[in-house]
Design a protein with these regions (language model features):
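C-terminal domain-tail junction helix/linker
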Residues: 46, 143-145, 166-220
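Residue-level detector of anion-binding/catalytic polar loops
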Residues: 8, 110, 146
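Short small-residue beta-strand/loop micro-motif enriched in glycine and branched aliphatics
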Residues: 82-86, 148-150, 174
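Mobile genetic element proteins and their domesticated derivatives, centered on retroelements
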Residues: 14, 51, 75, 81, ...
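Active-site beta-loop-alpha junctions of metal-dependent nucleic acid enzymes
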Residues: 68-69, 85-113
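An active-site-proximal beta-strand-loop segment
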Residues: 50-83
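Basic, flexible linker segments flanking DNA-binding modules
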Residues: 1-60, 120, 127, 131-137, ...
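RNase H-like two-metal-ion nuclease catalytic core shared by retroviral integrases
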Residues: 116-118, 126-140, 145-170, 185-189, ...
Length: 220
């Protein structure tokens, strides 16, 4: 329109002039994201984060297992950081349900809430059967445990279990190889007991998760 009305200077020149005169439109800055304060747990079992890790294929050395996929199911109590892991050959709602059964037996206190992502091994939220509970959710209900799913595409909301998986890559998978599923399951169990639940942590006042649980049980 300016050209049609006889404007002959360059558009960049006009822009510089308007900016110099201070008459450019001012766009307000985008509001700064302020994360919500993290909800602290008051007792063990109040909320436990659960997630699944795919075992790196580079760790599988035996020709009989090369090309197969193993999975590490992980649960972390938010209060004590106590962790329970188990090896599985399949990644589905049945494996998730069996993991919950074993977790309930292993954890020394009642579990109030389980928090997961929106994977189909946990929920039908993003499937064609969204109104139908998964076998995993059925087992949770049988034990009186509520199921909380995090916001989609925000793994930081399950941050404790996500960080533990990154540590697993550094401490375990980077240095270990597995020649069968049974070998993987055995090594994973030993690693978790030795290098995690008995390992002192700064957020726990340099106590181990096992010690925090022990102290809590002694106080009730």
């Amino acid at each position: 329109k300016l050209k049609q009305r006889g404007y002959s200077r360059s558009i960049p020149g006009l822009y510089r002039f308007l900016r110099k005169q201070g008459i450019m439109a001012v766009h307000p800055p985008n509001p700064k994201y302020i994360p919500k304060p993290y909800e602290q747990m008051d007792y063990p079992g109040q909320r436990i984060q659960v997630d699944v890790k795919f075992v790196p294929s580079a760790c599988l050395k035996n020709p009989k297992v090369i090309g197969k996929q193993f999975f590490q199911y992980t649960a972390i109590d938010e209060y004590s950081r106590w962790r329970f892991v188990e090896a599985f050959e399949e990644h589905n709602t049945y494996s998730s349900a069996m993991f919950i059964e074993h977790l309930v037996k292993a954890f020394p206190l009642p579990i109030q809430c389980i928090q997961t992502d929106n994977g189909a091994e946990f929920t039908n939220r993003f499937t064609t059967h969204r109104d139908k509970p998964t076998l995993f959710q059925v087992h949770l209900k049988q034990h009186g445990i509520c199921h909380k799913v995090i916001r989609p595409f925000t793994p930081r909301h399950n941050g404790k279990v996500e960080r533990s998986h990154r540590k697993d890559n550094e401490r375990f998978y980077a240095t270990h190889t597995f020649y069968s599923f049974e070998d993987f399951a055995k090594q994973l169990k030993v690693y978790n007991r030795r290098d995690y639940n008995n390992f002192p942590m700064r957020p726990l006042g340099w106590k181990s998760p096992n010690q925090v649980l022990k102290d809590y049980l002694a106080s009730v």
